[in-house]
């Protein structure tokens, strides 16, 4: 339906021109990353613009989103560990005994890194430690501090049942082992090109995070975690106007997203959520959360779709209106010709399903809050700015990535 070029990119241009800090989610091969870099130059954007890629190591900045100096609250840090494991579990995962036991290990190990080894408190260090240490070493590590013992109580209390302990640990390592072994992801998440505090009043930032279809199951939970980290920093004291721009937003799941637009709007935060059809929201978040998400967006655009489930709901958004129907009857008999004209009024859908299947690219109907047009049916101009290829951030060799990974291994081997 042309949503990105006709609605998305013009909105992105407006946010950047207005000097908002932001988080941009890019799904299509650096498309929005190129756009953002171009717009930053075009509009003399006053803040830093950083790009994150987990596939192209020369066109990515590196950052540690869970760095203790960034996540300064222990309770928040532990909640982020919960968010990460939940994201790797998927939407159909159960928070059962095994999940809770695995989460206890993750939180117990993580809090020790946070407090005792802040220089190694990165996602790559934590997951590699958990996946390589084994039951005996992890038990000893968790017993090293009272706080970690409490958090991992279920695992430690099962000390007399090696089978139970192994089940808890394997539940965790099965979720994290692929991440621990992905050297490029470890490279990106163990660097410090910038602090992942996007609403720092002294240094606001625009960050463009790119997914990749080939490994999206691996990196989507990481991106979800990064968004959660940034969103949990907001308070009423925030003075930095901020926006989340999520193109193809249903290609990953965000913890508690149904609450975010309504809550964060009080903190100077705006959302753009683009998806191919509303039915995809329901697939990711469920029926009731979909309703909550949709109700929290004041401006809604509906374009062409042939999604059967979406076509059931789209006409309901705009309701019905009374329309006059005129029927004419003609008859003849020996006495001559008879004609009658009947006018009736009946309620019909303002836009029916056929209407939504026949919209052109860039053509949308919708409703807007606080606007001079409450409802609209328009065809928008396409964004046509010429964009340059993404610049190289750092020249990177394969040996650099390997050396970084081996350094992580050396770091965790020295931890007691």
Feature annotation, model-predicted:
Residues 261-263, 267-368:
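Conserved ATP-driven motor cores of ASCE-family P-loop NTPases powering translocation/secretion/packaging/pilus
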Residues 1-269, 284, 295, 354-416:
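P-loop NTPase motor domains
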């Amino acid at each position: 339906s042309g949503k990105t070029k006709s609605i998305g990119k013009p909105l992105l241009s407006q946010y950047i021109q207005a000097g908002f800090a932001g988080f941009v989610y890019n799904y299509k091969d650096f498309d929005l990353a190129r756009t953002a870099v171009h717009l930053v130059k075009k509009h003399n954007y006053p803040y830093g613009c950083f790009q994150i890629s987990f596939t192209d190591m020369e066109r990515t900045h590196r950052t540690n989103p869970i760095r203790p100096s960034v996540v300064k609250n222990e309770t928040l840090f532990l909640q982020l560990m919960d968010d990460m494991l939940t994201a790797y579990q998927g939407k159909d995962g159960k928070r059962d005994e095994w999940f809770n036991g695995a989460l206890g290990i993750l939180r117990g190990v993580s809090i020790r890194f946070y407090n005792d080894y802040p220089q190694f408190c990165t996602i790559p260090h934590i997951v590699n430690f958990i996946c390589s240490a084994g039951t005996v070493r992890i038990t000893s590590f968790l017993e090293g501090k009272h706080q970690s013992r409490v958090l991992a109580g279920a695992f430690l209390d099962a000390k007399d049942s090696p089978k139970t302990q192994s089940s808890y640990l394997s539940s965790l390592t099965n979720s994290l082992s692929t991440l621990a072994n992905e050297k490029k992801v470890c490279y990106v998440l163990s660097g410090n090109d910038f602090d992942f505090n996007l609403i720092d009043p002294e240094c606001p930032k625009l960050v463009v995070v790119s997914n990749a279809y080939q490994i999206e199951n691996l990196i989507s939970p990481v991106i979800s975690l990064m968004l959660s980290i940034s969103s949990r920093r907001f308070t009423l004291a925030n003075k930095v106007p901020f926006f989340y721009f999520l193109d193809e937003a249903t290609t990953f799941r965000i913890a508690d997203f149904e609450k975010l637009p309504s809550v964060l709007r009080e903190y100077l935060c705006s959302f753009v959520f683009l998806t191919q059809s509303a039915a995809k929201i329901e697939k990711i978040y469920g029926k009731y959360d979909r309703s909550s998400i949709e109700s929290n967006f004041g401006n809604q655009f509906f374009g062409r779709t042939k999604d059967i489930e979406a076509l059931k709901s789209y006409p309901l958004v705009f309701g019905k209106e009374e329309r006059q129907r005129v029927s004419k009857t003609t008859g003849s008999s020996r006495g001559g010709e008879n004609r009658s004209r009947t006018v009736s009024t009946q309620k019909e859908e303002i836009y029916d399903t056929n209407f939504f299947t026949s919209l052109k690219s860039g053509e949308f109907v919708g409703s807007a809050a606080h606007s001079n047009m409450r409802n609209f049916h328009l065809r928008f101009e396409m964004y046509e700015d010429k964009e340059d290829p993404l610049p190289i951030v750092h020249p990177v060799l394969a040996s650099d990535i390997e050396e970084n990974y081996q350094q992580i291994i050396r770091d965790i081997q020295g931890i007691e």
